[in-house]
Amino acid sequence: MYSDRDEIILALFKQIEDSILLLLQWNQEVRDANDYLLSPEGMKNLAASCMLIEAIGESVKKIDRRTDGKLLPLRPEIPWKLVMGMRDHIAHGYFDIDADMVFLTI
């Protein structure tokens, strides 16, 4: 039996996993950042992808807070700080989103 805190953390990881799978699905035919910029459909994909990347970063921040910073360091091969930083860049960058950076992130 998991504690309420553990259930929340597991749910956050599941949301992250689902978001990553959607990102991969939505972007499987994107060959470079220009694919986002050359059509209205590409721009929609860029905007939607940014929202999921932002949600992933926010979920990672919540996990880190709920575990008092003790869980994420157990997986140092994952660039957690970059994930959270990308969230901040998208959330506060507004119209300064770099399509190349989003493409490389995905």
Question: Predicted regions: what is each one?
Answer:
Residues 1-106:
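Solvent-exposed interaction patches of small proteins and small membrane subunits
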